[in-house]
UniProtKB/Swiss-Prot annotation:
InterPro entries: Pantoate_ligase, Pantoate_ligase_C, Rossmann-like_a/b/a_fold. It catalyses: (R)-pantoate + beta-alanine + ATP = (R)-pantothenate + AMP + diphosphate + H(+). Catalyzes the condensation of pantoate with beta-alanine in an ATP-dependent reaction via a pantoyl-adenylate intermediate. It holds the Pfam family Pantoate_ligase. Transmembrane segments: none annotated. This is Pantothenate synthetase. Belongs to the pantothenate synthetase family. GO terms for cellular component: cytosol. NCBIfam families: panC. It comes from the Bacteria. The reaction proceeds by a bi uni uni bi ping pong mechanism.
């Protein structure tokens, strides 16, 4: 039976009772979909206990409207956790997780490309909340999707830099039948925007060069933040209407921009 915990002191008491067990952790902002469920299933396969967090982290939004419009589906998410046999759900309040009112934060002073360039201070909020959650949950393993690939690499660096006793595991992107990565943002797309998002995915996954992809997307009416190759992967961030979508794929060495 899934136990839902709001008070962090309650969780801290519970955590002491499972010290001898392996604990898998999947941090999310809720609005769960099949991509999240794939992370949870892997955790269940590899650990005795699986913990899911549901927390819409205000400090990682550099756009107030984006935070305001983020889907809030707590009851639905808890029901999905119960259906999928998750042991514990952490659902803390903002004040509980930020008793310091965000006076203390984790930052990476060297990152300035891709999401760091287009979403100022975003990763400060991400790294800070991840650090708080990892210290609270003390997981054996924590699972992150590769859709947010830059975030995944930063979290791995965070765990290494601060000697956290947690293995950070990246999991493959879950896509729909058109190749579009599953994302909570997809649910905000109108029917016409969804068709355009599918075109983004088709063009991005083509054999075109970065510049050719940019031009093709612009011709479709899609606003491009970046299409670039970095460390043997191709990355994209675009706007379909007011919805921002990201994707990344590994590529062959002879197909760089």
């Amino acid at each position: 039976m899934t136990k839902v915990i709001e008070a962090l002191s309650d969780w801290q008491s519970i955590r002491k009772t499972i010290n001898d067990l392996s604990v898998g952790f999947v941090p999310t902002m809720g609005n769960l979909h099949a991509g999240h469920l794939s992370l949870l299933e892997r955790s269940k396969c590899e650990n005795t206990i699986t913990v899911l967090s549901l927390f819409i982290n205000p400090t990682q939004f550099n756009n107030k409207n984006d935070f305001k419009n983020y889907p809030r589906t707590l009851a639905q998410d808890i029901a999905m956790a119960e259906e999928n046999g998750i042991d514990y759900v952490l659902a803390p309040t903002d004040d509980a997780l930020y008793p310091d009112q965000y006076a203390y934060k984790i930052t990476n002073s060297t990152i300035n490309n891709q999401e760091a360039e287009f979403r100022p201070r975003h990763f400060d909020g991400v790294l800070t909340v991840v650090m708080k959650l990892l210290l609270l949950v003390k997981p054996t393993r924590a699972y992150f999707g590769e859709k947010d690939y830059q975030q995944l690499q930063l979290v791995k660096g965070l765990a290494e830099a601060f000697f956290l006793d947690t293995e950070i595991i990246g999991c493959k992107i879950v896509r729909n039948e058109f190749g579009l990565p599953l994302s909570s943002r997809n649910r905000r797309l109108t029917e016409d925007q969804y068709q355009l998002a599918q075109r983004f995915s088709e063009i991005f996954h083509s054999d075109l060069s970065c510049d050719e992809i940019k031009n093709a997307l612009i011709q479709e009416g899609i606003i491009v933040d970046y299409i670039e190759d970095y460390n043997e992967r191709r990355f994209a961030a675009v706007h379909v209407g007011d919805i921002r979508l990201i994707d990344n794929i590994p590529f062959a060495k002879d197909k760089k921009c």
